[in-house]
Amino acid sequence: MEKCYTDVTEFAIPNSTHKLYLSPVLDGFNSEIIAYNLSTSPNLEQVKSMLDQAFSEDHYTNTILHSDQGWQYQHQYYHHFLEDKGIQPSMSRKGNSPDNGMMESFFGILKSEMFYGYEKMFHSLEQLEQAIVDYIDYYNNKLIKVKLKGLISVQYRTKSFV
């Protein structure tokens, strides 16, 4: 059974009263970000959009989707959506972020490579949003991963299904 991971992380830049929230889904097979949503509010609409994008097709049936115990993942809509798609929800133990280590690791890599120390370079949330979009493209299509035998996430998936 395949396993995917999800969570929400927050970005704040100086000189802005607003924040940006990233809600991705990471495929545990090849560490690819298969879907994500960026929003100025971590609300249910953000999670709905991310779920629709990630699981529009049936090839994730019988997958486990792991998350923390955030309110979004306890919501009735979330559980009904997963049930309708044949996806099994899984949640971390309360206050135990290592349970969602793959997602937390992605957030750590993302923030250390393109955000921490660079916050002042972003003069608007739009600039930050574009930088995140560009980084996710880089992460999926250009970043070589040792755990994938020196391949890129998309290459590893493609090679595995040939």
Feature annotation, model-predicted:
Residues 7, 25, 31, 51, ...:
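Mobile genetic element proteins and their domesticated derivatives, centered on retroelements
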Residues 18, 36-58:
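Active-site beta-loop-alpha junctions of metal-dependent nucleic acid enzymes
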Residues 83-87, 111-162:
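C-terminal domain-tail junction helix/linker
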Residues 67-69, 75-76, 89-111, 126-129, ...:
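RNase H-like two-metal-ion nuclease catalytic core shared by retroviral integrases
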Residues 1, 22, 43, 47, ...:
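Hydrophobic (often cysteine-bearing) scaffold residues that line and stabilize catalytic clefts
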Residues 1-24, 48-49, 60-62:
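Mobile-element integrase/transposase regions
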Residues 32-36, 90-92, 116-118:
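Short small-residue beta-strand/loop micro-motif enriched in glycine and branched aliphatics
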Residues 17-18, 74-76:
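Catalytic cores and conserved motifs of cyclic dinucleotide signaling enzymes
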